Amino acid sequence: MSSGRGPRIPEYWYGQVPVPPFMRFMEVIYAGAVSLRRLAYRRGWRRRYGVAVPVVVIGNLVAGGTGKTPLTIEIVARLREAGWTPGIASRGYGRRDPKTPRWIQPDTPIELAGDEPAMIAWKTGMRVRVDVDRSAAARALVAEGCDIVVCDDGLQHYRLMRDIEIEVIDGQRRYGNGHLLPAGPLREPMVRGRLCDFRVLNAGQYSDRPTSGFGPGDWQMRLHIDHVQSLQGSRRRSLDAFSGQRVHAVAGIAHPERFFAMLRQRGIGVVPHAFPDHHFYRAEDFTFGSRLPVLMTDKDAVKCRAFADDWFFSVPLRVELPTAFWTALFDRLERLVSC
C-alpha cells in the first residue's frame, strides 16, 4: 500500500479533463512573459555570458522530472572515458540558502547541496558547482580546470551561452495537453524543441536508429536496473537476490510508480512508499511497521546515508542509448574544439 505522500499533478495536464478557464487566462499571461524574456536575450537587451570551453545543457520543456539527471551522469562518465575533464553546473533545487554559490562534494550535507547535485557528485566524483546563476557556475568550473561544462537542467537559463542542447522528453507523457503553465506542463512552447541539437525520449521503445524528429533525431533511452548497493559499506548484490521477496520500495521522484513497476518486473514484492519529489528524509519516515529490506533510487539514497542501516539499499539506474547517439554527440564536440 502506498504512503500516499507523492506529488499531486493537475489532472488536466495529462488527462482528458478540460482546462479550467482561469488557468487558460493565466497561460496567456505566462506565454507573454516567456516570449518577452526570449526576445530580450535575442535582441541583446539582456546580456548572455559564455565560457572558453564547450557547454552542454541537458534539460526539458515540461515541469517535473523526465530523466535528466541519470542522463547527465552517464554523459559525464562517457566524457571522462574519452579524456575530458567535465564539470557540472546546477541550480541545486531545494537546498538551504539557495542564493549562496557552493562547491558540492560527495559528503556535502544534503540540505546545503540539494539532492540532485549531491547525487551527481556522489556518482561521478567530478566537480559540481551550484549557483542560481549558471553562467557564474560555468566560469567557476573553467577556473578550476574543467575543459567542458555539463549543465544539469537549465534549458531555460538563457543567460548561459551553450554549444549543445539536449532535450529530455518523457516518452510516455510527452508534452501532456500541450498547454503552457499553469494550464499545462510546458515551460516553453513545444516548438522550442526544434532548436535543440538532440532530443532524448525516456521510456520510449528502444531503437538503434533515431526516429523522425529534428536535428540528429529523437534518440530513445532506456533505463535498466540489475543490482543494488548497500548504503552502509560497499556491499553490492544482484537484484535477483530479492526476487520472490517483499521489500519496502521508496521513491521521492517525479514518477515513483515507474520505479515500483521496474522492481515488480524483476519479481520483487513491492510495498510502495511514494514521497514528494526532492523530499528530504528523516529516520522517522522509515517507520513502516515491518522489518523488510528498503530499496530506493540513488536520488533517495543520497539523502539517507546519514541514518541508513544494513537493510537500506540503493538501486542504480543504468542508462542505455544507441551507439549512434554517442557517435553523433562526440562528433559534434570534436567539431567544436577543432574550430
UniProtKB/Swiss-Prot annotation:
It is an enzyme of class 2 (transferase). ATP binds at residues 62-69. Pathway: Glycolipid biosynthesis; lipid IV(A) biosynthesis; lipid IV(A) from (3R)-3-hydroxytetradecanoyl-[acyl-carrier-protein] and UDP-N-acetyl-alpha-D-glucosamine: step 6/6. Pfam families: LpxK. GO terms for molecular function: ATP binding; tetraacyldisaccharide 4'-kinase activity. It catalyses: a lipid A disaccharide + ATP = a lipid IVA + ADP + H(+). Its EC number is 2.7.1.130. Keywords: ATP-binding, Kinase, Lipid A biosynthesis, Lipid biosynthesis, Lipid metabolism, Nucleotide-binding, Transferase. One of its GO terms (biological process) is lipopolysaccharide core region biosynthetic process. It comes from the Bacteria. One of its GO terms (cellular component) is plasma membrane. The keyword Lipid metabolism applies. The keyword Lipid metabolism applies. InterPro entries: LpxK, P-loop_NTPase. Transfers the gamma-phosphate of ATP to the 4'-position of a tetraacyldisaccharide 1-phosphate intermediate (termed DS-1-P) to form tetraacyldisaccharide 1,4'-bis-phosphate (lipid IVA). PANTHER family: TETRAACYLDISACCHARIDE 4'-KINASE, TETRAACYLDISACCHARIDE 4'-KINASE, MITOCHONDRIAL-RELATED. Belongs to the LpxK family. This is Tetraacyldisaccharide 4'-kinase. It comes from Xylella fastidiosa (strain 9a5c).
